[in-house]
Amino acid sequence: MSLLTKQSTFQGLSGTVEYTVDYPEQSPVGWALVLHPHPLHGGTRDNKIVTTVARTCVQNGLMAIRPNFRGVGESSGEFDQAVGETADMQACVQHIAQTWPQLAQAPWVLAGFSFGSAVAAQLYAELADQNQSLPTRLMLIGCAVERFRYRPLAMPPDTLMIHGEHDEVVPLSEGMDFARTHQLPLTVIPDAGHFFHGKLLLLRQIVQAHLAGLASA
């Protein structure tokens, strides 16, 4: 995926959270946090949508962080309907700032796929409420936010939403409802299902376009 990939951990609210760091070839110009789908349905940091987004971020000079949520791999704890997972990701943001202080003021990207989109959206809202550093780009792919929403949300107007036309897990109408509620544009990939089989190149191109100009943002 990149010149260098390493494994590490940080302390979440229920114990150890493991994550993978994908480094760009040069010194990173920023970083990305990419969140995986439902832990109880096979979702891991190695999901192909997660790795596709992370790879695209790395190719744009970002250091990409791919955590395993509670109960996945070596991460401690049990599935918590996005509540505990969001709290863990707040701890992750703090961990990144402490571990890589040179990136504390750099642009960063927050992306989530399926269940990960629910954590990403609520993490953004939690950070905003606490006046913490907000991501420069927010991406919600296969948006399942309302299935796991536990708090009010206010999404930035430049949020990137991507959905498959024939999503069999989260119907397109569900993504449209979320987009309508928050007055966001929604990018639909024709003939794509939830896992974007055969459409990863197009997905990567859409993410790449959204990342354009990030370093100067």
List each model region and its residues.
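Serine-hydrolase catalytic machinery in alpha/beta-hydrolase-like enzymes
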Residues: F10, T16-L103
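Catalytic histidine-centered segment of alpha/beta-hydrolase-like enzymes
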Residues: G77, A192-R204
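Gly/Ala-rich beta-loop-alpha elbow adjacent to hydrolase catalytic centers
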Residues: G112-A120
